[in-house]
């Protein structure tokens, strides 16, 4: 991994870009994952590279739903394993959720590489998806495979940085689907039950904080949070945030400004 000086004004952006490249070199991340990361980074620029209120609202609803779930599962793909392996394990622990390796471009080598990366942070962690025996209806080839004891039986599934086709297929199966996607226009964002429009490197640590905070909430409080949540409004509010921010930047000028609000 290329060493980036912390004095660089785009340190964190470059750092995570290198993590994705490293993930590909380790055999975890598919080439298409690099393209997906770049697309997400572009939307992160638009929202201001921070967690905005609609994302916070979505995270609270997502955590409430996961805490009430009987069989919650957090899906892990190559980009997730490259960017937030430790944070993924911490989130699953906080939610008492299972972890399943689930890949669009599935190969046994990629599954093995992701499992090895996750086990660096917890050698005893139970990982599902190593030998999946079930298939999501309507999805052909390797991308449709899921673990019988994981996503197949899950009532609530977290599918971060996910393909829209699979998100939609999981919804058709009757799963409650939560996605983390920086692109509010993507099919995953539009088809999920709860869409967290935020960078996963910010979202997972915050969701872990919320899980620890909300685990003592009453069942009634958690249900109220979910019932009051409107995913359509969340997506609309994200688009309005982007519009208003770009309008403000255009009116105030950006030429030679070192920082953009």
Curated annotation (Swiss-Prot):
Protein name: 4-phosphopantoate--beta-alanine ligase
Recorded catalytic activity of this chain's protein: (R)-4-phosphopantoate + beta-alanine + ATP = (R)-4'-phosphopantothenate + AMP + diphosphate + H(+)
Function statement: Catalyzes the condensation of (R)-4-phosphopantoate and beta-alanine to 4'-phosphopantothenate in the CoA biosynthesis pathway.
Complex and partners: Homodimer.
Species name: Thermococcus onnurineus (strain NA1)
Key word Nucleotide-binding present: yes
Keywords carried by this UniProt record: ATP-binding, Coenzyme A biosynthesis, Ligase, Nucleotide-binding
Binding site for ATP: 17, 39, 181-182, 187-188, 199-200
């Amino acid at each position: 991994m290329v060493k980036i000086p912390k004095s660089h004004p785009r340190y964190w952006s470059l750092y995570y870009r290198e993590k994705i490249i490293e993930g590909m070199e380790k055999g975890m991340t598919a080439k298409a994952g690099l393209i997906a990361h770049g697309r997400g980074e572009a939307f992160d620029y638009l929202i201001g590279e921070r967690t905005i209120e609609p994302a916070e609202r979505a995270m609270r609803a997502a955590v409430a739903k996961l805490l009430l779930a009987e069989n919650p599962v957090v899906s892990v793909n190559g980009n997730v394993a490259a960017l937030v392996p430790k944070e993924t394990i911490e989130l699953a622990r906080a939610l008492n959720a299972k972890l399943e390796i689930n890949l669009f471009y599935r190969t046994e080598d990629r599954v093995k590489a992701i499992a090895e990366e996750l086990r660096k942070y917890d050698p005893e962690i139970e990982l599902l998806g190593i030998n999946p025996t079930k298939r999501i209806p309507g999805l052909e080839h390797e991308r449709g495979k899921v673990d019988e004891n994981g996503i197949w039986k899950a009532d609530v599934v977290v599918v971060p940085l996910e393909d829209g086709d699979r998100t939609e297929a999981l919804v058709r199966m009757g799963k409650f689907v939560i996605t983390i996607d920086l692109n509010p226009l993507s099919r995953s964002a539009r088809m999920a039950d709860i869409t967290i429009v935020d960078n996963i490197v910010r979202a997972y640590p915050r969701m872990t904080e919320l899980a620890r905070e909300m685990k003592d909430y009453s069942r009634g409080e958690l249900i109220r949070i979910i019932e009051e949540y409107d995913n359509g409004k969340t997506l609309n509010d994200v688009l309005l945030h982007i519009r208003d921010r770009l309008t403000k930047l255009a009116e105030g000028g950006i030429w030679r400004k070192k920082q953009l609000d």
